[in-house]
């Protein structure tokens, strides 16, 4: 069965930057947030949180289809914070984390509103994504990479994790 590697974390932790580097190194990647918008895999746009409310059923069906039809020798890399695939489709999950200071700065640079910044900072403090991934996939398939360091160093650590999983 074909599987995916998830690159996840609170918005602003570096998922897309790292996934783009993986793509440049030959890994097939999907930016899940972009896919949701382009293929309208959402219920509606929430003005308060300034985000799309994802239709999980539609998204999972589409992601499973993409995983099953992946023709690469590598597993599909899924970049996003809304991915909760059935465990049998997930090879490994890399959760990117960063300090609150860095997160606030990165989200401010994206021109996020204060409410959205606060919501994401709270999610990072409460370890919501890490907790969800551990519950879904178990500690043997989840690892954490700190992204407060340079992009190059973060990418190097993620690449080590990906290669470790591929060699198992």
Model-derived features: where do they sit?
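Pre-Walker A (Motif I) flank of P-loop NTPase domains
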Residues: 1-4
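ATP-binding Walker
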Residues: 13
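ATP-dependent small-molecule kinase phosphotransfer cores
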Residues: 27-86
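Walker A/P-loop
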Residues: 16
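P-loop (Walker A) phosphate-binding loop of NTP-binding proteins
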Residues: 10, 22
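Hydrophobic anchor at the beta1->P-loop junction of P-loop NTPases
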Residues: 7
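NTP-dependent small-molecule kinase module
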Residues: 73, 104-112, 134-168
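A glycine- and Lys/Arg-enriched "phosphate-lid" helix/loop adjacent to the NTP-binding pocket
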Residues: 44, 97-144
């Amino acid at each position: 069965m074909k599987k995916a590697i998830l690159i996840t974390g609170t918005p602003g932790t570096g998922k897309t930057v790292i996934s783009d580097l993986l793509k440049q190194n030959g890994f097939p990647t999907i930016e899940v947030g972009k896919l949701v918008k382009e293929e309208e895999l959402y219920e509606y746009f929430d003005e308060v949180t300034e985000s799309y409310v994802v239709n999980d059923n539609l998204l999972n069906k589409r992601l499973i289809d993409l995983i099953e039809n992946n023709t690469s020798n590598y597993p599909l890399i899924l970049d996003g914070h809304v991915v909760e695939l059935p465990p049998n489709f997930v090879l490994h999950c890399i959760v990117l984390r960063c300090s609150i200071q860095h997160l606030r700065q990165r989200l401010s640079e994206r021109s996020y509103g204060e409410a959205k910044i606060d919501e994401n900072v709270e999610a990072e403090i409460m370890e919501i994504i890490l907790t969800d991934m551990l519950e879904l996939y178990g500690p043997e398939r989840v690892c954490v990479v700190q992204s407060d360091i340079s992009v190059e160093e973060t990418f190097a650590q993620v690449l080590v994790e990906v290669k470790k999983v591929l060699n198992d």
